[in-house]
Each structure stands twice: as C-alpha cells, then as structure tokens.
A protein has these predicted regions:
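Conserved C-terminal helix/tail region of periplasmic/extracytoplasmic solute-binding proteins
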Residues: 318-351
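Short, solvent-exposed loop/beta-turn-alpha elements that line the ligand-binding surface or hinge
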Residues: 30-33, 223-227, 298-306
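Short, surface-exposed acidic
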Residues: 34-42, 143-151, 280-292, 324-332
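Secondary-structure end/capping motifs
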Residues: 247-323
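Short beta-strand->loop
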Residues: 82-89, 150-154, 212-231, 329
Length: 351
C-alpha cells in the first residue's frame, strides 16, 4: 500500500523535458501537494552531495528527467532505480570544424585531430560519452571508425556538481560559473589545437553561428533513429526503487504531471518555446534552431518500442567504451506500472 511522502527531490537537465515544464507551471507541486508531499529542487541545494545525485541518483525519494548517460551509469553501478518513462525530443548533434580546416564532410575527418572533453574527476563523464557517440555514429555512415581519427583530450578538473548554482532574476545555471568554461574542446578548436569537435543542443547552434564554424554533419537530423540516438534521445524519467515500493502514488503523480505538461505544450507552441528557453538557459530563437519549430510537439513521454530499442543500443555502446562497469537489459530496468495506472484511470473516467 502506498504511504504518504513528506518530501520529493526532483531534478532535470537543462533541456526540453515535460518535468521541467510541470515544475515551472506548478503542476508537479500541485499534484503532490494534494498528497501532502512537498517538492524540493535537487539542483538548487547548497549540499554538493545532494547536487551530485543529479548524476548518481543516490538520493532516496527522488525523480530525474534528463540525459540517459548518468541514469544508465547509476543503474549499471548498482543503484536501485527504475525508468517509468522515456521521452524523445530530437536535437541538433553537430560535428564542427573551422571553415579553413579543409574538413567539409565526414570523410575528411580521417586522420584529423578530434577534440574530446575529459572530466577525469567526474563519476561519469557524460560530455565525453556523448561526443564519442556522435563521432562514432557520424563515422560509421562513411565506413570509418573512431580509431581513424586522432583523439585529443582536454582535461577539466573537478566534477559537474562542484559549483553551487548561480542564479540571476530567478534563472539558474546548473554547475555555477566554472572557471575555464564548460567546453574546453571548443577553446582548443578556436586555437587550432584540434580540427573538429562535437557539440549538441541550443548552445551548439548558437556557438557555431557566433564563431562562424562549419557544420560537418548534424547526426541529430539523420533519418535512422539509432544514428540520432545519444544522451538525449531518448531521455529517461527515472525514480528510485524505494519511491516506487513505498510511495507508488507519488510516482503516478509525477508521471501524471509530466504528461499534463506535455499535453498542454501541444496546444501552446509559443509559450512552450519560452519555457524551454528558460529550461535551457537560452533564447527562443536558439531553442527553435536546436529542437525545431515543432519542439512543442516533440515532448512525449511514453515507453514505445523505438525508445526502448535505442536505449538498449546506447547502453551497449556505453559498456563497449567502458563508460559503465557492466551492461544490463533495459527492459528489466523499466517499470510500466505508473503509466499503466494513469491509462487505467483515464479509461475509467472515459467509461
């Protein structure tokens, strides 16, 4: 039997998610407030160990909606978590070069220097993993492998959760204002230390335009889903096992607020772009460039077969590159009961 929960910790990545909109609209707080549960932002905590749970999901009674790499790593490392939803919002995934580098297409990458971030102090370096994934997917389209390029690492000290959140006018940047910036490989590209790099999302298109970079390929627009599959495709909505076992109604309430936000987004494209711009610390223009003018229609959390297959393929990739200690069956990680409970409730109301 579900027991009342005092506090739910929530976190989401600075990317398009239904949870992010549900938080901004107050719907998560409303849904759980009716159960006597208050919500608290994990990312805004002054405690570094609490903020680190965004990556290792160590905090009990917490929900996370965002990039799948940390969630997969946590599961592979023994964290008792379950996925209750998957969302697939395609985004730009760019391999970029300087315009005078001579790199015009993927074939031209052979034998060239490719810059990779290297957060050696992080439990899971999701930035490195997603860059290698983007590179590998691009190269395989031309019969090439990652070994066909020269990898150049850009070491970054500390972890992703070291800095306390920095906020202006209610808008925060997760990770604070890190000395040296968040993309040392971009600096390396501009200095001529490497020939190409990988960036994705709203900031990728903004930086590419600002610095006049050449887009070698956008794997995020490829017609094959497994080529587009990366950290954000699909994204995972995950909770800890204790929350499911002890506070099942809370898990259902979380998912219900996410689906409510996504349904609202379908009918409110302009408002949705504004919310997504706030979520991604970007502007509405760059959100449209990165996630499409139909970004409001891409917010769909479910458990469809395409997403499950892509998540398994991505998990296998992470194991092959030793980003996770062991592989596992994604289907065993998924708990469909909260989604089934919501659908059953809708059917009863309709009947």
């Amino acid at each position: 039997m579900s027991q009342p929960l005092d506090t739910l910790w929530y976190t989401r990545c600075p990317v398009p998610t239904g949870l992010g909109i549900a938080v901004q609209k107050g719907w998560l707080e409303q849904a759980l407030g009716d159960q006597g549960t208050r919500i608290q932002s994990l990312r805004e905590s002054d405690n570094q160990a609490v903020r680190e749970s965004h990556f290792d999901h160590s905090l009990q009674n917490s929900v996370r909606h965002g990039g799948s790499i940390p969630a997969i790593w946590a599961r592979a490392s023994g964290r008792e978590t379950r996925v209750i939803g998957l969302s697939w919002a395609d985004e730009v995934q760019l391999i970029l070069s300087l315009p005078d580098s001579g790199i015009r297409n993927v074939k031209d990458l052979k034998g060239r220097r490719f810059g990779l971030p290297d957060w050696a102090g992080a439990q899971i370096d999701f930035t490195r993993a997603q860059a290698i994934r983007g590179l590998e997917n691009a190269l395989k389209l031309e019969g090439l492998e990652v070994q066909d390029v020269e990898r150049v690492d850009f070491r970054q000290g500390g972890t992703f959760s070291d800095e306390t959140p920095h906020s202006i006018a209610g808008l925060g940047a997760f990770g604070g204002r890190r000395r040296g910036g968040q993309n040392p490989e971009l600096t390396g590209l501009l200095r001529g230390e490497v020939d190409a790099i990988f960036l994705k999302g709203a900031h990728a298109v903004q930086l590419a335009q600002q610095f006049g970079l050449h887009t070698v390929i956008d794997t995020g627009s490829h017609p094959e889903p497994l080529i587009r599959s990366n950290n954000g495709t699909p994204r995972t909505l995950s909770v800890d096992q204790h929350l499911l076992d002890t506070h099942f109604d809370t898990a259902v309430g979380i998912l219900g607020s996410v689906l409510r936000a996504e349904e609202w987004a379908q009918a409110h494209p302009e408002d949705t772009r504004r919310y997504l711009a706030r979520e991604s610390n970007s502007s509405e223009y760059w959100v449209a460039q990165a996630y499409g003018e139909d970004a409001h229609q891409r917010l769909r959390t479910n458990l469809d077969e395409r997403s499950i297959a892509a998540l398994q393929d991505f998990t296998d990739f992470l194991r092959r590159w030793n980003f996770i200690p062991q592989g596992f069956a994604v289907r065993d990680w998924i708990d469909p009961r909260p989604l089934e409970a919501l659908r059953s409730a809708v059917a009863k109301r309709a009947g």
